[in-house]
Amino acid sequence: NPTDFRLLIDEYHILLKAYSYRQKAVDGVLDSFRKYKSFCFMSATPISADFTPSILSDVELVEAKWDNTDTLIVKLDQTNHPYVKAANYINAYKKDGYLEINGNKSTEAYFFINSVTDIASILEYCQLGNEEVKIVCADNPSNRNKLAGYTISNSRSANKPFTFITSKSFEGADYFSETGMCFVVSNSSNTNTLLDISTDIYQIAGRIRTESNPFRNTMVHIFNSVGKRKLNL
């Protein structure tokens, strides 16, 4: 009986993002949430008022105000060939075993790319071995076929020098690394990799939880406005 329970919908902005392919499930939530003893829709990146479903228009909005907040630094790296640029960063890590930024050395790189096909291309081009990479994506036959020779992991698996993450873990997954650096890769010719700056960027920025990590609040966004999808090398 729903009236015996309280309902909490965490990361509720995903309801809007997922509506195109999970319409029945999302409608089920929106049609039934008022039946519960109480309800709460919660997110660190709430839906803009312009796009909030009308059924939520009369729900009280409570905004948490924090006394101390971190400033996110996004380093923009525009290029005609985003995957080549990502490969260059990987090769720089491999050459010296680290990437030095402002006197701090990063020994682990986290690449957020929402395309298993493109991740596989980068792995092949950079000649990365299974022991060097952690790949976090949906574990299904299609992805296993694309990533033949590589293990599909989860966020709790042991750290590797290079971690590749699809939208499966853009939200709700925590990573712990003393020197991990976040790289977001977007390609204008592959819509799967395009990000919502009001939600995705902020969610990705909070994935590495280790407070002592000097790169915790820094992110490199590799992107293009024109160019081809493939590495073509």
Where are these regions (language model features)?
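Interdomain hinge/linker at the junction between the two RecA-like core domains of SF2 helicases
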Residues: 44-95
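Conserved helicase ATPase core of P-loop NTP-dependent helicases/translocases
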Residues: 134, 140-166
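Conserved Walker B
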Residues: 11-15, 169, 188
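SF2 helicase motor core recognition
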Residues: 1-2, 43, 162-182, 203-214
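SF2 helicase catalytic motif II
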Residues: 2-38
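Conserved SF2 helicase motif VI
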Residues: 189-217
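Conserved strand-helix element at the start of the C-terminal RecA-like helicase core
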Residues: 89-126
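A conserved SF2-helicase RecA2
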Residues: 220, 225-233
